[in-house]
A protein has these predicted regions:
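Blade-edge beta-strand/turn elements of extracellular beta-propeller
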Residues: 117, 159-171, 215-227, 265-278, ...
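Non-catalytic accessory segments flanking enzyme active sites
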Residues: 38-133, 143, 232-290, 322, ...
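Cap/lid segment of the alpha/beta-hydrolase catalytic domain
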Residues: 118-134, 143-149, 160-166, 402-408, ...
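Long hydrophobic segments that form regular secondary structure
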Residues: 226-306, 311-319, 324-329, 334, ...
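Active-site-proximal cap/loop segments of hydrolase catalytic domains
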Residues: 484, 490-690
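A flexible loop/linker signature enriched in serine peptidases of the S9 family
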Residues: 92-99, 121-125, 144-153, 168-173, ...
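Beta-propeller blade signature
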Residues: 103-104, 155-159, 202-214, 259-265, ...
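Hydrophobic beta-strand positions that form the internal "hydrophobic ladder"
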Residues: 87, 140, 185-186, 245, ...
């Protein structure tokens, strides 16, 4: 192997003293915003040029780009939403950079284009994010995302004429969209950032506002805020019948909430008076819906794997009552449709859906198509139908329409594929981690490879954090890897939400090392089980999963042939200094508290690189407008990797422009990025594209 000559990166002399330990941070200057710091911008340009030169020489890149493009080229639909007689849904013909939004007058009406984000920006990096029609379908409230940023602009469309109203809301972020009749809506926003701080300033003082249609944002009414606790976040939802608004407050990313209610029928007398419902930030409360003054919630209060409870606020002495008790599976969420409840569960990281009466009595299970992920089941009281989606590793999303009276489902929108899903095998294995805990893992490969028992280059993916469950889903990029003869493995690590609160708690704060041990054990299992050869294992993870990749590469560099750390949290001593990073203390701890500092210092990827050790080939990927995990994390980590003597394998960084943490990325950019990553991983695991 010929050594790679990396661009030169200036080393600064920054040294912090934290709890008696001197911590060098020579690349602190790379935290500066690429838009305002010419030195950082020049560094990004040099690094991208070097990485581009390497990736373009890889013999399999063009073939991967061709196959990913072909695999993405199928018509796909979003789950329809009904409002009045109108049905709203998104559709992408295949290779459009952004999905379009359509409406039908009645289920079988002619589709009419309402919103085409592809016309918004020449580089297609402005995307339609969330959207919600008013209850009667007269208006459509939608949010616009630019350049991948978490900031949103809210706008309103008159559906009948297809014309936008003059209303425009700025500085919305992490917001629900909640109509109050058709007079206006509730939303959450932050104060406008200072000059030059749009993509880096810490997010404090989120508040809920009411916007009345036809008025300027400056006239919006403050609904709920906690100025004495600027660290708290607040969101608002409105029950389907419009009677109650529910304010959900949090202190971080952990699902421990306080709840307040606002009786919208008394607004002329009480204004936005919020009455406390749940206090203490101790448990998760997911609103199912409400009728009149009765509310239904999915909660882990006295039920680590969740149960369904209800309360009647109109009763003389309102009390919580249990409708559906905790089961062996993890209850994820619920909806009320017609006169029934649909509850969605996870069983070993795969979806189940059950229909109950409003009194909690079981009616029937919804038949899903094997191992996979279901989503949707939305609707209103009185609706005769609901729509849901189902997907798996080998099956792109199919939309189903379910008749609530008969319980029968029929396809509403099915993709036409350029591959045969039946050629692929999905297997779920359970392996023992370092401490003996059994951890589930999905393994996907061609049936012919599985039958032959042949070890092949394998891409192992993980996350392990923030109570987020990884479930089966289709990816054209992963399918291109499988088509080429590789295997894909998804490990359901501790720290995730696959098995309720205990599983999450076992992978956060002082238990974070369990996540890394689980991932390392997954790699060892794949090698020992003959799934992949030694020297054929690649790993990948994004965001918290990027941290995972960086940590395990430091701890076991010998185990992996290649690694792709995507938009990762790499400096665990400064993550809370930027944008939403301060929320993550629920999972990571506080860097300015000694006990937490010692834990973070021990695994922080940026601070634990091991000079003189042979490292795997590493491709770090990030984007210049990522204001969730700011790109400075990846910039500093890549600079430190390139400066250290870590062997001859490449350690490169790919920095996307006009993109963020992942959502809203144009199809063309996703294809190019996917081809770069697969070609890099294939080069160092020995995967040969057929």
């Amino acid at each position: 192997m010929t050594p790679i000559h990396y661009p030169e990166t200036r080393r600064g002399d920054v040294v912090d003293t934290l709890f008696g330990e001197k911590i060098a941070d020579p690349y602190r200057w790379l935290e500066n915003d690429v838009r305002s710091d010419p030195e950082v911008a020049a560094w990004v340009e040099r690094e991208n040029k070097a990485t581009r030169g390497y990736l373009d020489m890889l013999p399999q890149r063009a073939r991967f780009a061709q196959r990913i493009r072909a695999l993405m080229d199928y018509e796909r639909f979003g789950i329809p939403t009904k409002a009045g007689r109108r049905y709203f849904y998104t559709r992408n013909t295949g290779l459009q950079n952004q999905a379009q939004l359509f409406v039908r007058e009645g289920l079988h009406g002619k589709p009419r284009l309402l919103i085409d984000p592809n016309a918004w920006a020449r580089d297609a990096a402005t995307a339609l994010d969330a959207w919600k029609p008013s209850d009667d379908g007269k208006y459509l409230l939608y949010s616009v995302q630019d350049g991948g940023s978490d900031w949103r602009i809210l706008r309103v469309l008159d559906v009948a004429g297809g014309k936008p109203l003059a209303d425009e809301i700025r500085w919305a972020k992490f917001t629900d969209l909640a109509w109050v009749g058709d007079e206006g809506f509730l939303y959450s926003r932050f104060p406008e950032p200072g000059a030059g701080e749009t993509f880096q300033a810490r997010n404090y003082d989120q508040a809920v506002y009411f916007h009345r249609l036809g008025t300027p944002q400056t006239d919006d009414q403050l609904v709920y805020a906690t100025p004495d606790h600027p660290e708290r976040g607040h969101g608002a939802t409105v029950t389907q019948d419009g009677r109650l608004a529910v304010i959900t407050s949090s202190t971080g990313t952990d699902a421990r909430y306080e709840l307040h209610t606002i009786d919208l029928s008394r607004r002329s007398r009480d204004g936005w008076k919020a009455r406390p419902l749940v206090s203490g930030f101790e448990h998760d409360w997911k609103l199912v819906d409400g009728m009149g003054q009765q509310l239904w919630f999915v909660t882990n209060w006295q039920a680590p794997r969740y149960r369904l409870v209800a309360i009647d606020l109109g009763a003389r002495n309102p009390e919580w009552r249990e409708l559906v008790r905790q089961s062996d599976e993890t209850l994820q969420q619920g909806t009320i449709i017609g006169s029934q409840l649909v509850l969605q569960y996870l069983k070993d990281a795969s979806s189940q859906a059950l229909v109950f009466g409003l009194d909690g009595r079981t009616a029937r299970a919804i038949s899903l198509n094997g191992i996979g992920t279901a989503a949707g089941f939305a609707g209103k009281p009185g609706d005769p139908e609901t729509f849901y989606a189902f997907t798996s590793f080998n099956r792109p999303q199919t939309i189903y329409r379910m008749n609530l009276a008969s319980g029968e489902s029929e396809p509403f929108a099915s993709p036409k594929l350029s591959f045969d899903p039946r050629e692929y095998d999905i297997d779920q294995r359970f392996y023992a981690s370092k401490d003996g805990t059994h951890v589930p893992m999905f393994i996907v490969r061609k049936k012919s490879i599985a039958a032959a028992g042949k070890p092949v280059p394998t891409l192992l993916y993980g996350y392990g954090g923030f109570d987020i469950a990884l479930t089966p889903g289709f990816s054209a990029i992963r399918m291109a890897w499988l088509e080429a003869g590789g295997a894909f493995a998804l490990a359901n690590l501790r720290g995730g939400g696959e098995y309720g609160r205990a599983w999450h708690d076992a992978g956060r704060l002082a238990n974070k090392q369990n996540v890394f041990d689980d991932f390392i054990a997954a790699g060892e299992f794949l090698i020992a089980g003959g799934i992949t050869p030694r020297g054929g294992l690649a790993i990948q993870g994004g965001s918290n999963g990027g941290l995972l990749v960086g940590a395990v590469v430091n701890q076991r560099p010998d185990l992996f042939a290649a690694a792709n750390a995507q938009v990762g949290v790499m400096d665990m001593l400064r993550f809370d200094r930027f944008t939403a990073g301060r929320y993550w203390v629920d999972d990571y701890g506080y860097p300015d508290r000694e006990k937490d500092f010692r834990i973070l210092r021990a695994y922080s990827p940026y601070h634990n690189i091991r000079p003189g050790t042979d490292y795997p080939a590493i491709l770090v990927t990030t984007a210049d407008t990522d204001d969730r995990v700011v790109p400075g994390h990846s910039f500093k980590y890549a600079a430190a990797l390139q400066a250290a003597p870590l062997g001859l394998r490449p350690r490169l960084i790919r920095i996307e422009t006009r993109a963020g943490h992942g959502s809203g990325k144009p199809t063309d950019k996703a294809i190019e990025e996917g081809a770069d990553i697969l070609a890099f991983l294939a080069q160092w695991t020995g995967l040969k594209v057929e």
